Structures are given as structure tokens and as C-alpha cells.
């Protein structure tokens, strides 16, 4: 009798995706991040579902419903902080996953890559709307500032902003629709993840060397299932350490003050994972220019397959490109730091220089480094 996992219409899909999947024998721990992102999404959907059972999306009761979850619901504090810090872990894994793709040239699978960039946008949109829901000061003012950016769009901007708000300011209608979108988007993300994996399994995984590995493949199970379990344990350890020892480490104290449209916080800033984009936005004195720079700071990832001029896929054997890559990483850390600082000297000029460097490295320096390396290798 043939094994059911190879014949059953549903089980064989799982079999071809997670069990008998031919996988390169040399993929490193950087390839664990995909499964960790899947785990993060599962954690966020589950904790979010339980939070939604107790949350009310009304301006009068939203803040107190979150307080009620933390104080009165059994382990409500745990669910709430797992959800809040789970978002941070999600973004850490996302940034590492994207960085891995850039370093090892995984972006040459451009369908997989482009679906991944769309996923990044979807996760960022979901996280932004989720941050508005507790209806604290930073929730309200963050929502006001970021949605207001759309008014920079010529001709339709103001109408568009009021349409999104459902009125003339961020109010009850805005909160209700943000809750609806925040609830539904993770399921759309889950569907996009399936598409992402579908495209990936058409080509098979890349590997650190960037060479074709068809002649040396091993089954995903048990080798990489065991390896992924180690990653899962480390992720859960990190998340639970954060949740149980310093749950508010990555949050903003202003969000423990209920939203007040009449009192602006001294420094409006988003969660840490948006600070690099926020710094790029603020570094341009023009509103529309800033919004375009903000969008292109992420959208530029879609250009990587076009900007790949090297004869080698991976950066593993390209020291010059490696150097530029790590300067880009350092630049992103600088932008993240600047995004959390007030708009004053010397932070303004540092932010502007870091923003220019970000786009320059990606658009000119990395492709130039690739051409130099090709020349040095006489290719």
C-alpha cells in the first residue's frame, strides 16, 4: 500500500512543501527565518484573536478595554504583551530575512522576491493600524500624522485623507475601520505567504554559495525540521524573556496616556521598526518629496533584481560588495537612531546624509562594486 502522505490530495501538498521537499544541503541558519516568520504570524493571529474577543473599537472605551484585558482577563496581560512584542520579533525576523535575501542574491527569484516585498508592505500596514487601536496619545497622534501624509498627493489628497478618516479628523469612524482592517489583513498576509511559498517551490531554495545545488539536495524532514525547531525555541525564548521581564521596553510611555486631541506629545514617533523610514520621511523638507522618499525606501527593494550586475549570485565571494552591504546595514541603524531623535541640530543633517547614503549605496555604489569585481575576475 502506498504511503498516504504521498497519495492523499491534501496531505501530499504538505508533504511536497515540508517533508519530501528537496533542499540544498548547505543552507545556513539564515534560512531558518522563513519558518520563524510563519511562527510569528501564527502567534500574532492567535493572540490577536483572543484580544479581539475583549477589545472594543470605540473611542470612549478602546483605552479602558485594553486596560480591562490587562487587569481582569485571565492571562490577558500575557496575551496583550505577547501580541505587542510579537510584532517586534516579527519585524526583527523580517529585516533579517530581507537582509539574507540581499546578501545571498535570493532576489534573482523575482516572483518570490516581489511577493515578499508586497508582504513587507502588508505587514507594515497591519502593524501601523494595530498601533492605533489602544487609543493612547501616540496611537492617536501617530495615526493623525501618518494618514495626513496622504494629503500631499496632488489634487485628490485632502479628499482622500477625509475619506480614510471618515470625517474631518481621526475619530470613532477611523478607529472602527482600522480595527476591521487590522483584523482582516493578517489572513490576507497568510494567503500571500502561500503564494510566496508557491513561487519559491517552483525554483527551489537558494543557498549561501549562490551556486546551483540540484546535484546535492537532501529531504527537508528530518534535517531542516530539527534545525527549524531549534530556531523556534530560540525565538520563543527571546519573545518570552521580553514579555515577562520588560514588556514595555520597546513601547512608548506616551501610549499609557489616553488619546487627547487637544494635547500634542512633545515628540511624535512610530514604533522602533518604522523609525528608519520615518527618518527618511523627515529628512526631506518638502511634504510630497518626503512621502515619495518614504514609499521608495521600501519599494526600492523591487529594483534589486534589475540592479544585479555581478556575474556571481551571492556576496559570499565578493569582498567589495560585502563591505558596501555592511555599510548599508550600519546606515539603516543610523537612520533608526535618528528617527527616534527630536528634529534639531545635529540630528537633521545626520538624517539627511544617512538618507542620501541609503539611496546612493543601493542605486549606484553596489552595482558599481559588482562591475569592479567582475573586472577584477576578468569576467
Swiss-Prot record:
One Gene Ontology MF term: ubiquinol-cytochrome-c reductase activity
Keyword Mitochondrion: yes
Subcellular localization(s) per the UniProt record: Mitochondrion inner membrane
GO biological-process terms attached to the record: mitochondrial electron transport, ubiquinol to cytochrome c
Binding site for heme b b566: 97, 196
Gene3D superfamilies linked to this entry: Cytochrome Bc1 Complex, Chain C (1.20.810.10)
Cofactor: record remark: Binds 2 heme b groups non-covalently.
Cofactor(s) recorded in Swiss-Prot or TrEMBL: heme b
Main location: mitochondrion
Pfam assignment, any one: Cytochrom_B_C
Matches recorded under InterPro entries: Cyt_b/b6_C, Cyt_b/b6_C_sf, Cyt_b/b6_N, Cytb/b6-like_sf, Cytochrome_b, Cytochrome_b_C_euk/bac, Cytochrome_b_N_euk/bac, Di-haem_cyt_TM
UniProt-annotated binding residues for heme b b562: 83, 182
Protein residues bound to a ubiquinone: 201
Keywords linked to the UniProt accession: Electron transport, Heme, Iron, Membrane, Metal-binding, Mitochondrion, Mitochondrion inner membrane, Respiratory chain, Transmembrane, Transmembrane helix, Transport, Ubiquinone
Bilayer-spanning residue ranges: 33-53, 77-98, 113-133, 178-198, 226-246, 288-308, 320-340, 347-367
Membrane topology: Multi-pass membrane protein
Note in the entry: Heme 1 (or BL or b562) is low-potential and absorbs at about 562 nm, and heme 2 (or BH or b566) is high-potential and absorbs at about 566 nm.
Protein family per UniProt: Belongs to the cytochrome b family.
Protein purpose: Component of the ubiquinol-cytochrome c reductase complex (complex III or cytochrome b-c1 complex) that is part of the mitochondrial respiratory chain. The b-c1 complex mediates electron transfer from ubiquinol to cytochrome c. Contributes to the generation of a proton gradient across the mitochondrial membrane that is then used for ATP synthesis.
The name this protein goes by in its record: Cytochrome b
Organism (species): Poliocitellus franklinii
Organism phylogeny: Eukaryota, Metazoa, Chordata, Craniata, Vertebrata
Amino acid at each position: 500500500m502506498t504511503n498516504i502522505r504521498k497519495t492523499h490530495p491534501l496531505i501530499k501538498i504538505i508533504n511536497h512543501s515540508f517533508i519530501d521537499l528537496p533542499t540544498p544541503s548547505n543552507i545556513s541558519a539564515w534560512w531558518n527565518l522563513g519558518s520563524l516568520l510563519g511562527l510569528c504570524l501564527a502567534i500574532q493571529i492567535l493572540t490577536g484573536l483572543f484580544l479581539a474577543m475583549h477589545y472594543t473599537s470605540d473611542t470612549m472605551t478602546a483605552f479602558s478595554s485594553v486596560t480591562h484585558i490587562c487587569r481582569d482577563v485571565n492571562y490577558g496581560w500575557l496575551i496583550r504583551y505577547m501580541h505587542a512584542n510579537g510584532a517586534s520579533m516579527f519585524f526583527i525576523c523580517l529585516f533579517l530575512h530581507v537582509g539574507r535575501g540581499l546578501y545571498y542574491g535570493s532576489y534573482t527569484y523575482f516572483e518570490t522576491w516581489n511577493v515578499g516585498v508586497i508582504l513587507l508592505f502588508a505587514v507594515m500596514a497591519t502593524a501601523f493600524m494595530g498601533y492605533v487601536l489602544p487609543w493612547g496619545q501616540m496611537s492617536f497622534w501617530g495615526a493623525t500624522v501618518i494618514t495626513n501624509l496622504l494629503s500631499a498627493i496632488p489634487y485628490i489628497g485632502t479628499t482622500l485623507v477625509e475619506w480614510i478618516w471618515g470625517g474631518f479628523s481621526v475619530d470613532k469612524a477611523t478607529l472602527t475601520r482600522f480595527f476591521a482592517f487590522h483584523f482582516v489583513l493578517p489572513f490576507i498576509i497568510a494567503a500571500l505567504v502561500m503564494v510566496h511559498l508557491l513561487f519559491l517551490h517552483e525554483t527551489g531554495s537558494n543557498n549561501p554559495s549562490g551556486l546551483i545545488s540540484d546535484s546535492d539536495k537532501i529531504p527537508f524532514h528530518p534535517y531542516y525540521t530539527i534545525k527549524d525547531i531549534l530556531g523556534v525555541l530560540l525565538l520563543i525564548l527571546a519573545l518570552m524573556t521580553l514579555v515577562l521581564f520588560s514588556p514595555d521596553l520597546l513601547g512608548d510611555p506616551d501610549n499609557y496616556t489616553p488619546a487627547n486631541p487637544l494635547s500634542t506629545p512633545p515628540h511624535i514617533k512610530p514604533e522602533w521598526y518604522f523609525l528608519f523610514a520615518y527618518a527618511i520621511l523627515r529628512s526631506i523638507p518638502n511634504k510630497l518629496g518626503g512621502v515619495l522618499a518614504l514609499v521608495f525606501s521600501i519599494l526600492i527593494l523591487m529594483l534589486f533584481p534589475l540592479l544585479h550586475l555581478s556575474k556571481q549570485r551571492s556576496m559570499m565571494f565578493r569582498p567589495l560588495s560585502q563591505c558596501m552591504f555592511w555599510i548599508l546595514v550600519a546606515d539603516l541603524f543610523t537612520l533608526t537612531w535618528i528617527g527616534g531623535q527630536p528634529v534639531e541640530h545635529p540630528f537633521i543633517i545626520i538624517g539627511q546624509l544617512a538618507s542620501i547614503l541609503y539611496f546612493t549605496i543601493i542605486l549606484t555604489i553596489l552595482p558599481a562594486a559588482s562591475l569592479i569585481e567582475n573586472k577584477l575576475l576578468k569576467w
